[in-house]
Amino acid sequence: MAIRVTFTYSSYVARSIASSAGTRVGTGDVRSCFETWVRPRFCGHNQIPDIVDKSPGSNTWGPSSGPRARPASSMYSTIAREILEEGCKSPLVLGMISLMNLTGAPQFSGMTGLGISPFKTSSVIPFLRGSKWMPCSIPATLSTDIAEVDRGGKVCDPKVKLELSDKVSNGGNGWVNKLLNICSEDAKAAFTAVTVSLLFRSALAEPKSIPSTSMLPTLDVGDRVIAEKVSYFFRKPEVSDIVIFKAPPILVEHGYSCADVFIKRIVASEGDWVEVCDGKLLVNDTVQAEDFVLEPIDYEMEPMFVPEGYVFVLGDNRNKSFDSHNWGPLPIKNIIGRSVFRYWPPSKVSDIIHHEQVSQKRAVDVS
């Protein structure tokens, strides 16, 4: 069975060689191929194969026939012996190496002299596709059509396209941006826990919790904010700042503790006149248009002067806030810090700074 398969395979190779060379293989050619390659390999196990004759008149492919005799390629015979370590000197192996030399050489002067056109490896052995299994044959960017022969003998022409991008990610697409753009609730909570633990009771910032609804809709009950303590060392508190402060003396006199902390928004600074009339807040006779207030004020307040060293504070929820309209201006020295960032809950993480400039107040003069 093995001899039959080997003979059939050898005949197929011989026909392929002859077909590529433009010559039809006949019975004599197949027999010659069998005598030259197959028989010495499989029928002469007890005989040492003849060493290829290196004389000028010898022919590797068959018996010498005068002027058509081709000189043997000693170089490829030597390579074959070196590769196989003298273990196999079969004409079949040497012939295959010579065949590889013919198909891969840049010039085919020996074959063209015999009137045989050059041929490709893929036409000799269809199932050996060098352009596919050779890694070096795939360029960086490739778009080509390759005809394939599958095991069923069907020919297909798929479109094979390989594209390698040469774009290099810059620093702007690194882990910093990923961290800033992260939207996971767990990640925000973890980041908040680390940040607050570092800033807790420090000289730079202090976390605080909102205990009431006096700052709605800006801050809700249970929200937690970070108050920074640095900016007021370099400047005075400004209008629209949300400040955290200790209970002023007037509240301490009425039973509050010095440790009690409040959070309100500054609406007027020292030297201003503040009043509430017809549901509107007026500072220096100017109506204040405040987008963070949801409803008109339902109380009246006579004009009040803010002395030096004081500010006037109100809650954003004007009708439900215990603030300066009840107990008067707030001493600046009682201010602990400015609330700048809400870190809890994670779904509402944001800054709470009012970015409206004091010089660009949306105020309307009273006519």
Curated annotation (Swiss-Prot):
Active-site residues from the entry: 214
CDD domains per UniProt: S26_SPase_I
Membrane topology: Single-pass membrane protein
Location of the transit peptide in the chain: 1-68
Main localization of the protein described in the UniProt heading: plastid
Lumenal, thylakoid side stretches: 206-367
Biased composition (Low complexity): 62-72
Cystine pairings recorded for this chain: none
GO process annotations (BP): signal peptide processing
EC number: 3.4.21.89
Region (Disordered): 53-72
Gene3D superfamilies in alphabetical order: Umud Fragment, subunit A
Keywords assigned: Chloroplast, Hydrolase, Membrane, Plastid, Protease, Thylakoid, Transit peptide, Transmembrane, Transmembrane helix
Catalytic activity: Cleavage of hydrophobic, N-terminal signal or leader sequences from secreted and periplasmic proteins
Family: Belongs to the peptidase S26 family.
PANTHER family: SIGNAL PEPTIDASE I, THYLAKOIDAL PROCESSING PEPTIDASE 2, CHLOROPLASTIC-RELATED
Function: Cleaves the thylakoid-transfer domain from a chloroplast protein.
NCBIfam families to which the protein is assigned, alphabetical: sigpep_I_bact
Name of the protein this chain belongs to: Probable thylakoidal processing peptidase 2, chloroplastic
The organism of origin for this protein: Arabidopsis thaliana
